[in-house]
Amino acid sequence: DLAAGDIDVVVTAPINKENVQEAGFGFTGHTEFFADRFGGEPLMVMCSERMKVGLVTIHVPLAQVSGMLSTELIVRRLEQLRRMLVTDFRVVEPRIAVLGLNPHAGDGGVIGSEEEEMMRPAVAEAVRRGILAFGPFAADGFFASGSYTKYDAVLAMYHDQGLIPFKSLSRSGVNFTASLPVVRTSPDHGVAYDIAGKGVADEGSMRDAVYAAMDIFRSRRWYGEISANPLRHYERERGADVSVKDLKLPEQQDD
């Protein structure tokens, strides 16, 4: 129904990843499932009124994170995050902070080399492409000092690096799968079997996920409408301003 356009968005409820594997689901989470079904390279982003945190890597063991990182991947994630902020959240010139992988963001290569070898070059390349990217920053001081409030989004290198401060600082949040042709959101919590049937569950995040999906769909449609037929930039070709002719009505065109 989603692919056929019969519904506009999808909001998924929490799943138990162990149980769905036993049922033959075949994916580590909803994010990977939707990427497989609809194509594209998904970007997992946690969203709240206080912050937006994107992840370079998602559901992978921590021991594998460093080996998966590369300058090219980080640049792609920055491009995805910027595109999402512009099209889905109407941020005209988003500022994006990049977190380092190692303690103290590597201390100039003393505590790991990923920052110097991959992250700084990635930030520099992103800036060259017109993205307002900054960093890499040491994650602990970045959040403890409140520096995250100066940016429209934060790019974390791995799952817990982004989600621990997000859940600690945001009372409620939404998981948004960006960079897909469809809009998919979910609450920012798990199945919570420990409180099942006790009448104490908080519906806030699920409600926020529904509202966020609606808002993102409307923003994406709005952006598509305003950018569908842009006027050509003024250019000079052989001394003639070709855009002047382009902007005339058909009956006004010179032969």
Cite the ranges covered by each PLM segment.
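Anion-binding alpha/beta catalytic cores of soluble intermediary-metabolism enzymes, centered on
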Residues: 1-114, 120-255
